[in-house]
């Protein structure tokens, strides 16, 4: 299952500071307008990855229960499976959760290019349990057929603007923050 209790014993865990998705409303300096940003929604606080010979599973945990999957730009998972920036959108070869078949099935999209252009290449089960979300992917779908392998990953919630990497810095929440990725090495 996707619940945090089921994942508690799964190392390694990567963490993000909590409360960094807070809504912002502050007066501007002098005659400058107020700075208002209400895009904070799901506070991403931890992530884990596990794999076996057939699948690789990514899990993210939020500080509070995750909002409904019908929310716009909801809980994206971006994957770089080849470590080459030039072969994907900002290096990302796959994107999940931009589109869902239903609340329990995500559409797996591969970068098609140019720009922020994706095409469906498969579907995968989503496991949502309160503040925990997991997705299980066939390794063959991602081209991760041998051992060892490495995959860079990033969770993003509510960047608002599709195709703008800088939105990861200002809108919603990202794990890890900004333009960074985490790397999982499968042995």
Predicted regions and their residues:
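Generic structural signal for short, solvent-exposed loop/turn connectors between secondary structure elements
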Residues: 102-104, 122-124, 131
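Beta-strand-rich interaction surfaces with strong enrichment in secreted/lumenal proteins
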Residues: 45-48, 121-126
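Poly-acidic low-complexity segments
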Residues: 20, 80, 127, 137-138
